[in-house]
UniProtKB/Swiss-Prot annotation:
Sites marked Important for catalytic activity: E119, E139
Residue span of region 3-hydroxyacyl-CoA dehydrogenase: 311-729
GO process annotations (BP): fatty acid beta-oxidation
Cellular component terms per the entry's GO annotation: fatty acid beta-oxidation multienzyme complex
Binding site for substrate: D296, N500, Y660
Designated name of the protein: Fatty acid oxidation complex subunit alpha
EC number in record: 4.2.1.17, 5.1.2.3, 5.3.3.8, 1.1.1.35
Listed PANTHER family: TRIFUNCTIONAL ENZYME SUBUNIT ALPHA, TRIFUNCTIONAL ENZYME SUBUNIT ALPHA, MITOCHONDRIAL
UniProt function note: Involved in the aerobic and anaerobic degradation of long-chain fatty acids via beta-oxidation cycle. Catalyzes the formation of 3-oxoacyl-CoA from enoyl-CoA via L-3-hydroxyacyl-CoA. It can also use D-3-hydroxyacyl-CoA and cis-3-enoyl-CoA as substrate.
Family membership: In the N-terminal section; belongs to the enoyl-CoA hydratase/isomerase family.
Binding of NAD(+), residues: M324, D343, V400, V401, E402, K407, S429, N453
Chain's gene name: fadB
Amino acid sequence: MLYKGDTLYLDWLEDGIAELVFDAPGSVNKLDTATVASLGQALEVLEKQHDLKGLLLRSNKAAFIVGADITEFLSLFLVPEEQLSQWLHFANSVFNRLEDLPVPTLAAVNGYALGGGCECVLATDYRLATPDLRIGLPETKLGIMPGFGGSVRLPRMLGADSALEIIAAGKDVGAEHALKIGLVDGVVKQEKLIEGAIAVLRQAITGDLDWRAKRQPKLEPLKLSKIEAAMSFTIAKGMVAQTAGKHYPAPMTAVKTIEAAARFGREEALNLENKSFVPLAHTNEARALVGIFLNDQYVKGKAKKLTKDIETPKQAAVLGAGIMGGGIAYQSAWKGVPVIMKDINDKSLNLGMTEAAKLLNKQLERGKIDGLKLAGVISTIHPTLDYAGFDRVDVVVEAVVENPKVKKAVLAETEQKVRPETVLASNTSTIPIGELASALERPENFCGMHFFNPVHRMPLVEIIRGEKSSDETIAKVVAWASKMGKTPIVVNDCPGFFVNRVLFPYFAGFSQLLRDGADFRKVDKVMEKQFGWPMGPAYLLDVVGIDTAHHAQAVMAAGFPQRMQKEYRDAIDALFDASRFGQKNGLGFWRYKEDSKGKPKKEEDAAVDDLLASVSQPKRDFSDDEIIARMMIPMINEVVRCLEEGIIASPAEADMALVYGLGFPPFHGGAFRWLDTQGSAKYLDMAQQYQHLGPLYEVPEGLRNKARHNEPYYPPVEPARPVGSLKTA
């Protein structure tokens, strides 16, 4: 053994070839600060070996290196800029030493090689991969850019266009695509990986492969003419401006850095990468996006812990076909859980099967599946008008019309057709689970399971724990949701649960703005372009359905009369009474027509202004800041109330539910991350200006206490240790 660290070791393999093996405690390798330091120490030992002829890098895990240790990021990002820059220089000196070894080097890459893992293998001369490889640089999705030389080496290896596509989009690619673009040099079966790697190294050692020529382009300026450079970078900047926008600075910074570094060799190019990385790491966007990643890990870990002793349902059923039922059935079948889809008429069953078939055909068109796979999946969805086979199902989700009487009747009838241990769930979006459970003989086997539309796209499923829901019931439904590829978040019961409970105060703020004379077009524009929502409130209401919102508004008002009971007729009432139900019938705040792809396209409709005039004061202008404040304060206050009342268990779960269920702008990180970034005291000052607007604008006492004591909702993060100690971690 030449060197043994906590996360890697170095040893002789054969005939002058050494192997450096990443083998961290636990299930995965991460390129954390300690591993970077250990890699430097291993290279120091290696540089003294006069008999060294070649080096093989490999992993003892199912994945090579999954990336940097993102749990370290928030503390690293608090380190002063100069110290962070020094540490990056140190880390890059380690990878440069790997790249500068006087012998050929090869990385045998299996599973994931992402972020720092990818940057590590870019420093070797050759890369041999297994078919399960996923390799790429996802840093821009975390609000930063590659910092270990990825923005320098990748363009010089692949050419500007392919590298920009990966770096700017934060993409990873599979083995075959990586081979095609030159990111890896070969793909071999797992059992042949080491044998193949040694064979390539031997060829390089004997001179059959020119490893020096392979290495040289990574040390030089990017080989692009002025015209080629202008075309590549102009197109890339245009694409990034269109897709990322101003709220996500990292992709544009990465493109501009690669452009500026193109005319320099490795050392100066790395300096430019360093100068760009450090300011990005100190942005609120980076902290928010890293926070989302960590929250996602926390939520998924919590679900895994909850279901560790539970068998995943093997047979499911959906009550109520149509678009929603068909979407749920598709998602379950697609992920390997056969499903019975029951309805009371053929028309709805046909609609549900058509929806499932449409989604599968899209997968076929994209090359994700072949015809055989499509036929196999669709055959596991069984449409039926009766309860045949329900005695075999493990879990049933009801997705019928949002009417408590109908839901109670359907659930009570179904309970008589299933085994005593079968779990029942309701896809209700607003009706309290306790109310629906009153119709059942076994309420302990019942809970809520709220999907979001469209089911195949929206990652969140709210699992609602009723007063009598058993732990086993919740665990079974969480297991099914996880199997479907969803992110389940368990909440406690109340009208609207968590997501809709906090959404409708937001809509109430919108209604009040319109009542006071705001133009809905400007409100949408501000909330989309300035705050960053994917849709403004008017557009969102049209997508949700004005009729659906009108009904849900009444349910929420009955549940929370002090805050959510209206004392006036509002814009939603006016549109509902005029049968303008949104996209579903082509008329809402906008008029909708199908575009060439069959998707609804919104158009201006002057008639809506006359309708809104009947429930509004004369038009007047509002500043962007006032619009944002009046829209967001009711939502933020309600989110805080949900935490204080125990409806949602933690700020992390609340923020993930908002991002995954409502599209809360990820660069804000969620409501609690946004509050912490603003500061509770600053938020309180803003909110107090609008308290006269009513109870929805009254700040909860718990938030006032946070402001008084200057306490954040997330635990404070301490800066990482000084750079000197990071080196030797």
